[in-house]
């Protein structure tokens, strides 16, 4: 019965993670389109994160009252504060990087996350690296295969496999036409995105640590959003002190982007914390290579972009790597469950002997 419950939880978690990664690609595309209409990165982050804090406030109160949780100590709050500082830094560099480049490059560079996260998880003993265990080998091989697949999608186009006769949504394609960037902007954007995707794995590890101390995703998300919005506000006010007009929001795609971000980001972050709590940081990071495949598929479906052989081959490799890691995580979870089941009767016998 317990194994069935675990399988259901894993299925729900997998579905939620796929949905959030798809939503994240769409959010990045919407943000890039909004920047072409004058939206500033600081404006988006500050307003959307303030909205996110308000959205999370009721769930934080409900979660705090309805569950038996350890006290929210100053030490835990300080760690959430450090997480907020990390988040503010990689959010600012990430969105400014997208502003200079485009969402596809952001998805491509984010593929360094699994490798860095896996290395950090081994260093902090959150993951095992043993060539004697099939689950560990599967996770390592799957991570490498996913990274290779992502590189194939980015670096190799090949011949066209599929070309739509006309874009399904011509108005949307027209809106997203200004998303191209110059070569110099592309390099600046790439450097900023690389900094962001070096900090993200560090945040994943810290999230896992905080979830062990205080397993309440909505409460941690609320304080994270609150701290990140305050820190981003301070940085934004200093950085844009000579440009006060950026704080004025117009009733167009810029407002839509801010509101959608304020609603989407809290759920996105809470699901990430839930995934880290139940599966660890590597599970969270392995979904990043899927983002480049999702971006290619969404471009073909909604914008009428051509689908190339490189995208097909890379997509197959990403899928193989992803499912290999999932198999490794499932086998690891099954082994832990069986060992726990074996230990429980022994524990009961020891208690009976003592009585």
From Swiss-Prot:
UniProtKB keywords: Membrane, Transmembrane, Transmembrane helix
UniProt organism field: Arabidopsis thaliana (Mouse-ear cress)
Family: Belongs to the drug/metabolite transporter (DMT) superfamily. Plant drug/metabolite exporter (P-DME) (TC 2.A.7.4) family.
A GO-annotated cellular component: membrane
Subcellular location: Membrane
Secretion signal span: none
Superkingdom classification of source: Eukaryota
Membrane topology: Multi-pass membrane protein
Primary residence: membrane
The name this protein goes by in its record: WAT1-related protein At3g28130
Lineage: Eukaryota, Viridiplantae, Streptophyta, Embryophyta, Tracheophyta
Pfam families for the chain: EamA
Annotated ranges, domain EamA: 29-154
GO molecular function: transmembrane transporter activity
InterPro entries membership: EamA_dom (IPR000620), WAT1-related (IPR030184)
TM segment ranges: 11-31, 42-62, 80-100, 104-124, 136-156, 186-206, 218-238, 244-264, 290-310, 311-331
């Amino acid at each position: 019965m317990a194994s069935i419950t675990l399988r259901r939880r894993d299925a729900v978690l997998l579905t939620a993670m796929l949905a959030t990664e798809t939503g994240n690609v769409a959010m990045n595309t919407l943000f890039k389109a909004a920047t072409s209409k004058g939206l500033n990165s600081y404006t988006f982050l500050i307003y959307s994160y303030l909205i996110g804090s308000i959205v999370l406030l009721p769930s934080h109160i409900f979660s705090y009252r309805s569950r038996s949780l350890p006290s929210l100590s100053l030490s835990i709050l300080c760690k959430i504060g450090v997480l907020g500082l990390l988040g503010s830094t990689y959010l600012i560099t990430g969105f400014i990087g997208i502003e200079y480049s485009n969402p596809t490059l952001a998805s491509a560079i984010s593929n360094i996350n699994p490798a860095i996260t896996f290395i950090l998880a081994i260093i902090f003993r959150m993951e095992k690296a043993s060539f004697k265990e099939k689950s560990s080998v599967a996770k390592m091989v799957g991570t490498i295969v996913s990274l290779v697949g992502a590189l194939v999608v980015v670096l190799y186009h090949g011949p066209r496999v599929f070309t739509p006769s006309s874009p399904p949504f011509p108005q949307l394609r027209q809106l997203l036409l200004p998303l191209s960037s110059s070569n110099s902007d592309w390099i600046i954007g790439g450097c900023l995105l690389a900094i962001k995707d070096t900090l993200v794995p560090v945040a994943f590890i810290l999230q896992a640590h905080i979830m062990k101390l205080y397993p309440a995703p909505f409460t941690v998300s609320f304080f994270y959003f609150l701290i990140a919005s305050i820190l981003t506000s301070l940085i934004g006010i200093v950085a844009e002190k000579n440009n006060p007009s950026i704080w004025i929001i117009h009733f167009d795609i810029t407002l839509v982007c801010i509101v959608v971000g304020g609603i989407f980001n809290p759920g996105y972050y809470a699901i990430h914390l839930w995934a880290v709590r139940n599966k660890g940081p590597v599970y969270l990071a392995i979904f990043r290579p899927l983002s480049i495949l999702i971006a290619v598929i969404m471009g073909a479906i909604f914008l009428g972009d051509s689908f190339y052989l490189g995208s097909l081959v890379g997509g197959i490799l990403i899928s193989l790597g992803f499912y290999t890691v999932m198999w490794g995580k499932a086998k690891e979870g099954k082994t832990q469950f069986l060992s726990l089941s074996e230990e429980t009767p022994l524990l009961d016998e020891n208690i009976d002997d003592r009585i």
